[in-house]
Amino acid sequence: MEGNYCYRYPHPAVTTDCVVFGYDGLHLNVLLIERGGEPYKGCWAFPGGFLNIDEDAPDGARRELLEETGLHVTNIEQLGAFTTPERDPRERVISIAYFTLTRVQQVVGGDDARVARWFPINQLPPLAFDHQQMFEQALQRLSDCLKLKTGNFISGDFSYEEIDMIYFATLTK
């Protein structure tokens, strides 16, 4: 996009975050990154970042996930927009969050993520920003989608038995 834009009112920045659930054959996990920079340096968060001016939100979420963890996923589903004015201490930021289900794979921290790591869903560390709220909504949405067998959020092949096991894991968190 070319040109200068001048607005008479302040406007927010837009980020994307990706809640990635991973199944290892026994347990349901979630992928977190340890932040390498401020704000919340050293804290755990979901992979995500600022949307580029020339990309749509799902592509931005996939790009940030790949840059920060090395993980490529095909299917993601929009979870919602997180808009609390004070959610980011840097500036007014609106986050569009996505979620996906995949198999646990090797991940590595990259870009501004020092570490990428899978955590069991019932053993999460304290999360940066409003990511605890994001996690709770994503877990409920995952449970609902698995129960109803709806949505386009699965990246990978799972048997019906595995889907049932993952569904029951969402209920026992």
Model-predicted regions and their roles:
Residues 1, 16, 63, 67, ...:
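Intrinsic disorder/low-complexity signal
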Residues 1-4, 79-81:
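Short Pro/Gly-enriched beta-strand edge/turn motifs at strand-loop
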Residues 2, 24, 108-109, 150, ...:
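Feature targets compositionally biased, intrinsically disordered low-complexity regions
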Residues 2-45, 58, 73:
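N-terminal strand-loop-strand
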Residues 35, 48, 121:
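Active-site donor-binding loop signature of nucleotide-sugar glycosyltransferases
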Residues 45-51:
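Short glycine-enriched, charge-decorated loop/helix-capping segments at active-site entrances
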Residues 51-75, 80-151:
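Unchanged
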Residues 147-173:
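Polybasic "coupling" helices that flank or enter modular domains
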